Curated annotation (Swiss-Prot):
It comes from the Bacteria. It is a multi-pass membrane protein. This is NADH-quinone oxidoreductase subunit K. The lineage of its organism: Bacteria, Pseudomonadati, Pseudomonadota, Gammaproteobacteria, Enterobacterales. The chain crosses the membrane at residues 4-24, 28-48, 60-80. Its main location: membrane. GO terms for biological process: ATP synthesis coupled electron transport. It comes from Buchnera aphidicola subsp. Acyrthosiphon pisum (strain APS) (Acyrthosiphon pisum symbiotic bacterium).
Amino acid sequence: MISLFHGLFLSLILFILGLTSLIVRRNILFILISLEIMMNAVGLALIVVGSYWHQADGQIMYIFVITLAASEASIALALLLQLYRRKKTLNIDILSEMNG
């Protein structure tokens, strides 16, 4: 069984990896993937803490996190598909320019 420290440390590394990628990347698809990595890191932390305290609350919260991530990803991918069809790019710097 994984210890509390190792599980939370792995979760922290995943969260920092997702946050760094969120800040550095300029492609909206990679930003969405970074958000998914961050949500999975939070879910891992919930499961590790729940397992450490022998409570099922962490696993129940993780089900909610998975549900939130799935709905967020499906809506965001549908919006990205429409955005790409209209603008032919997913670069956030180009999309943020105002056209007048």
